[in-house]
Amino acid sequence: MMNVDLDKIQQAVRMILEAVGDDPDREGVLDTPKRVAKMYAEVFEGMHIDEEQYFETVFSEDHEEMVLVKDIPFYSMCEHHLVPFFGKAHVAYVPRGGRVVGLSKLARAVDTVAKRPQLQERITATVADSIMRKLDPHGVVVVVEAEHMCMTMRGVKKPGSKTITSAVRGMFEKDAAARAEVISLMR
């Protein structure tokens, strides 16, 4: 919860309650500003964490085949409406020189990047670019599929619709067969 101004968030939530016509001193919402401030500190904790730290500890393994962690659940907040979007991320890379990281580090990187006011496209690209920068693999593919509450509960109101984004780096950009293989494994 470092660098989060809880008091400012509480004041803002109190003002929102007043602005929509509610009484912020009403019993049911009396502690809402405090709860929302605590929740925002948690769901935006990625603002104060560098996802690349998870790729500092590298293991040397005689492995230059694909590594894929799929169905990594995540939750994020749309930066346009500050409502949630959530889904699954699939992260694959082909190590170079046997440089591998613990599998949990891929999931931690996804979580950290998602815990910011965010766009799905940016989550996808940031995770891929961080892996490329820190591990220097032969290639990376990140696919993210999510449902956006800004499309479900407001606006077009299309519950169940999914948005899919991908980031393709390194060998996967030019090698169509390798790209097709990893995409089929992610399904």
Curated annotation (Swiss-Prot):
Superkingdom of source: Bacteria
PROSITE patterns cross-referenced by the UniProt entry: GTP_CYCLOHYDROL_1_1, GTP_CYCLOHYDROL_1_2
GO CC annotations on file: cytoplasm
Pathway(s) where this gene product acts: Cofactor biosynthesis; 7,8-dihydroneopterin triphosphate biosynthesis; 7,8-dihydroneopterin triphosphate from GTP: step 1/1
Amino acids binding Zn(2+): C78, H81, C150
Disulfide bonds: none
UniProtKB keywords: GTP-binding, Hydrolase, Metal-binding, Nucleotide-binding, One-carbon metabolism, Zinc
Catalytic activity: GTP + H2O = 7,8-dihydroneopterin 3'-triphosphate + formate + H(+)
Gene3D superfamilies: 1.10.286.10, 3.30.1130.10
GO molecular-function term, one example from the UniProt record: zinc ion binding
GO biological process: one-carbon metabolic process; tetrahydrobiopterin biosynthetic process; tetrahydrofolate biosynthetic process
This enzyme's EC code(s): 3.5.4.16
One Pfam family, short name: GTP_cyclohydroI
Assembly with partners or alone: Homomer.
Family recorded in the similarity comment: Belongs to the GTP cyclohydrolase I family.
Name of this chain's protein: GTP cyclohydrolase 1
Gene name in the database record: folE
